[in-house]
Structures are given as C-alpha cells and as structure tokens.
Regions:
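Short, hinge-like loop/turn segments at secondary-structure boundaries
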Residues: 53-57, 114-117
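Short, glycine-rich nucleotide/cofactor-binding loops
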Residues: 8-18
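A charged, amphipathic interaction segment
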Residues: 78-133, 138
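Short internal beta-strands
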Residues: 35-41, 97-99
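N-terminal beta-loop-helix "entrance" segment that forms/cooperates
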Residues: 44-56
Length: 138
C-alpha cells in the first residue's frame, strides 16, 4: 500500500473541505506516500491567485457551529488549508493538477492559478497517475 499513491479529486471549494483534503494529503506525504490532487470546478476556483487566501465559506452541513469550529481550530494553531498544502509539498511528493475541462468551462488560464498548482491535465491522465491507489472524492 505504501507504493500506491493517495489520489484526491477535490471538487468542493469550501474552507472545511479544503482543510480536510490538505490534512489527508499532508499526512500521507509525511508517511512517504505520493499524493495526487486533481482540482475540479469549485475546488479549482479556490486555487486562483486572487482567491487562495480569501475566506471561502463552509459546507452547508456545518451549520451555525461551523464558524465556531473554524475559530477554535485557528486558536489551537491549525494552519490554513493552503499553508498545510505548502508544508505537505516540503514533506513529500505532492502533485496538484488542475482539470483541463474545468479550466475551459470556468475560463481559467494557467497563469491565474497559485504556484501550488503544478500543471493542467485531463481526467485520463489523472487516472493513469492514480494507478491502483485509492481515490478520495472531496
């Protein structure tokens, strides 16, 4: 299992789900597993240079308690999701690719993306890179 990459399809662009993806990626990278993140639609939008540090809201199920939990996490020293991903890149092999179809639909250019994003690929390339590794959909 250690040889198989952890693959994350990041579809959601809410703060809580981005944080969950970042924690999963950094944990796997720290253990020496390769991590592939494939950014689609709202997940891709979150990686725009002009949005990456913006407050992106919470998932609807977070409800009234969501904002309080985010504040508690920050108070406890939890880094923002994008900072966690930067650390994960330092810890191990983390490859973040933007979905080419999502780029076209959302009219996003590669230069619009934060340097965390390593490139652009199609879904077929993502599956080839995923190999036999697990795929998480967030």
């Amino acid at each position: 299992m250690e040889d198989e990459p952890l693959n994350i399809v990041l579809f959601s662009g809410t703060e809580d789900r981005l944080q969950a993806a970042a924690v999963m990626a950094s944990g796997a990278a720290a253990l020496g597993r390769k991590v592939n993140i494939f950014l689609q639609y709202w997940g891709l939008e979150a990686f725009r240079k002009d949005r990456i540090t913006a407050g992106l809201g919470l998932a609807p199920e977070a409800g009234e308690r969501g904002a309080a939990l985010v504040a508690e996490a920050a108070k406890a020293g939890q880094q923002p999701w994008h900072a966690t991903l930067r650390v994960a890149k330092e810890l191990g092999e983390l490859d973040i690719q933007a979905c080419s179809l999502s780029m076209d639909v959302l009219k996003i250019k590669e230069e619009d993306l934060d340097p965390l994003v390593d490139g652009v690929e199609g879904v077929t390339a993502f599956y080839l890179n995923a190999g036999d590794g697990h795929i998480l959909f967030i």
